[in-house]
Amino acid sequence: MTRATSIKDVDQHEATKSIAHFLKKSGKVKVPEWSDLVKLGVNKELAPVDPDWFYTRAASLARHLYFRPAGIGAFKKVYGGNKRRGVAPNHFQTSAGNCLRKAVQQLEKIKWVEKHPDGKGRILSKQGRKDLDRIATSLRSSGQQA
């Protein structure tokens, strides 16, 4: 008897890539038209190099919500970083909230994410958990064949 495979059982980088590929291939997630012009935070000097960064960020958010509920403010802290200020000491800056909010809204639109009943941010829905488990199972089976 084989035990069920969850997203916890596979490599996080491969899982995020596979989820992003699934989101792009499905065509249900719409990338905002401003996505090629935006930086991902005050602490960043340049815009993202990867043209599919929105799918990767949405996949990362979905994977994060698999483990625990979180809100946009928590995600801003997770994806934030040090702002380099020249000769002055670095200071922590949160990430850009609009990019995160739009990605979470797209995940809500495809029924992967729903609002927490107690108002504690967002949680992964049953449909989202089922799809992520299916992606993890396919990743694990392809890893065993290789």
Curated annotation (Swiss-Prot):
SUPFAM superfamilies hit by this protein: Winged helix' DNA-binding domain (SSF46785)
GO CC aspect terms: cytosolic small ribosomal subunit
Keywords: Ribonucleoprotein, Ribosomal protein
Any GO molecular function: RNA binding
Single GO BP term: ribosomal small subunit assembly
Domain of life: Eukaryota
Entries under Pfam families matching the protein: Ribosomal_S19e
Gene3D superfamilies from the UniProt entry: Winged helix-like DNA-binding domain superfamily/Winged helix DNA-binding domain (1.10.10.10)
Disulfide bonds: none
PANTHER family: 40S RIBOSOMAL PROTEIN S19
Family: Belongs to the eukaryotic ribosomal protein eS19 family.
Protein name according to UniProt: Small ribosomal subunit protein eS19
Encoding gene, per UniProt annotation: rps-19
